[in-house]
């Protein structure tokens, strides 16, 4: 109940302050706005462009009408020395009662600011960004952004008509963080930051680097996220994840692009629709994991997510952050792990993003020899800056902890490790010892992987690293980078080149098939047939295979049989599992209609069966990283383009014999030495009729004869199907 209305005369406004406020240049709004002590009480100043009148409503109900100042939107009045107040603002469209943003003290704790400055705040989005909070009984949103070289920062949004004069922020000087609590702003509000550089020049409005939600492209605003925690139902998965993802467990990864896996009438599915269709398919196909191409927010869909700007926000292209959480949750409930591609190497130059964020090279290197990547027209993160490396590590933790993601595949690691990557002499800056290694990135990756192991046990870190940099998967304590796995790019390049050759020439390239075993145990590897191999004019996996249709499909089936029995975890890009004949196009859905063709359906059936074989037999996965788990039986038959090897599991596990004929010639009576006699069972044959083959094989059973061969006391007389892979297991 109001007890009365008083009018008071405000203190005089300084003309310089008026001009700075009106031009959105004043860098210390808290020194002017809000209530400030005077000799007789307090003076209250507000700047609300567009307001027609403003009153202060005191805690006792008394209302004090503020006087309009010399500039439209300026209002001031005298208040008693003690007591709280609210603002009653008369806008052209009606009245608003609200708390004054400039009545609140500093928001972030000194400890938070210290952690941010040191790059040690692992829950960075709980401090920076937009967080819905309650302060002194008032509900609103705390905005905070790191911009140490800015001379002024304001938050603009749909709650203040995107007016940079309305909500200038407070600088916490020791950290370079600007903050402001804005009452009554809640989830769903769209916002950006309007900054001025160190010399006062206005910068393009910036999206929040730490926003947990972003506007759907082509919009570029950040959105205040709902603070309600997602209610997870994957306790069983999380409790067993470390065992499921141990080095001796099977890992078969289905790599996919969420926007083009399945399109209904040309429309992308949201996370829930994708889960409805994808999860049953992946489970039926026998993959243990899905790997999503980057889901962090990115402005250009044609980058496939590899040029992200919103490293804390799942892209809005497929729904809300909770939608992404539901997708992961549903995968886990069906026993499927989720790996996400993550890009800490570089970022695009879009004006609303991180580029020259506060008018200086803040996130990137200032020197283009270090900070600009010509191949991708992107800017390179300065991993040597504590706040930047901390920002990236916190992004990784956000997805691993908040979204229960089971692993990150770190993109473009080689481009980070070497200062001369894709640069000519004179175009790069050596390290302090004159070398090419990027010591700052090495330190960043080691710290990242050590923290992931410490704080998210059971999660895996996978490096896309294409060079011979030593110790990528070695422990940090032993001088390594600390990744769990590394993509085996050498295996992929060699074997795809071999498979693309006309069989008549393969005898001259036999080493491309066998060389991978020379270094197979130097790292812990994933065998990647990824999206990179079916784009940019390379053709599809099926399209790389030589010969007529029969030979191409047989080649593909044999190659997949080789891949799934070779040491190393498996990764197969979507569409390859049924022999997509054309390159992948992110603007189109996969050609699922091809499954009406028995040849394509046969490839799909083969992948389903070989996945189950891989999981069922420990010999095919338990010793991927141990030389005792592999033995050549026939590695030198270049003339016949045949390889044969034994895969061995732990003590008590049955060995598995793999034989592959990479020529279109049937091999009759091909003898293979084996470690024991009796009847060996043919458990897989890529030439089976169900896969689209000619059903040439060994009838399911082959009896080993007592004959010394290949270092063994027994031998199997085999029929090797043309362009075929067979797998046999011993008796017992």
Swiss-Prot record:
Kindly give the Pfam families that the UniProt entry links to this protein.
Answer: Alpha-amylase, Alpha-amylase_C, CBM_48, GlgB_N
Task: Report the SS bond pairs.
Answer: none
Tell me yes or no: is Glycosyltransferase among this UniProt entry's keywords: yes
Listed GO CC annotations: cytosol
GO biological process annotations for this chain's record? glycogen biosynthetic process
Q: Which reaction does it catalyse?
A: Transfers a segment of a (1->4)-alpha-D-glucan chain to a primary hydroxy group in a similar glucan chain
**Which NCBIfam families does UniProt cross-reference here?**
branching_enzym, PRK05402.1, PRK12313.1
**Protein known as:** 1,4-alpha-glucan branching enzyme GlgB 1
Q: Which organism is it from?
A: Xanthomonas oryzae pv. oryzae (strain KACC10331 / KXO85)
Gene name of the encoded protein: glgB1
